[in-house]
A protein has these predicted regions:
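N-terminal pre-ligand scaffold of iron-sulfur
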Residues: 1-61, 72-73, 77, 86-105
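Detector for the c-type heme attachment site
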Residues: 67-70
Length: 105
C-alpha cells in the first residue's frame, strides 16, 4: 500500500463527493464534516459511479443516483437494495491541507 495525494481539503465540500483516479483506480472521495472517506467509485449493483450521488451526513452514507443503492461511507456495506455486495474502501488521512488515500501499489 502507498499513500497517494487525492485532493486539497478545500476541493471537497462538506456533505459531498468528488471522483479522482489514483493508481489507475476510480475513487469516490467523500467528506462529512472534517472526516474524509474513500471508496471505489462504482456501485456494486450496476457498476455506475457513486461520486455523483447524494451524501447524507447524518447517516454517513452515499446513495447511487442511478438506482438508489445506498452505501455506508465508512465500510462500503450496502444499506438497502438493489445493491447486496459491499464496495471496497480505502483509508484516508489529512496532512498539510491535502487528503491522502492509502492505495494498493
Amino acid at each position: 500500500m502507498v499513500w497517494v495525494r487525492a485532493a486539497a481539503v478545500a476541493e471537497v465540500a462538506d456533505a459531498s463527493a468528488i471522483d479522482v483516479e489514483l493508481n489507475g483506480v476510480r475513487v469516490c472521495l467523500a467528506r462529512v464534516g472534517d472526516e474524509f472517506y474513500a471508496l471505489q467509485d462504482n456501485c456494486s449493483h450496476r457498476d455506475f459511479p457513486l461520486s455523483p450521488g447524494e451524501v447524507d451526513p447524518d447517516e454517513c452514507t452515499i446513495t447511487c443516483e442511478w438506482h438508489g443503492a445506498m452505501f455506508d461511507l465508512r465500510t462500503g456495506v450496502p444499506q438497502c437494495p438493489p445493491a447486496v455486495r459491499p464496495v471496497p474502501v480505502f483509508t484516508t488521512r489529512v496532512e498539510n491541507d491535502s487528503v491522502f488515500v492509502d492505495m494498493p501499489d
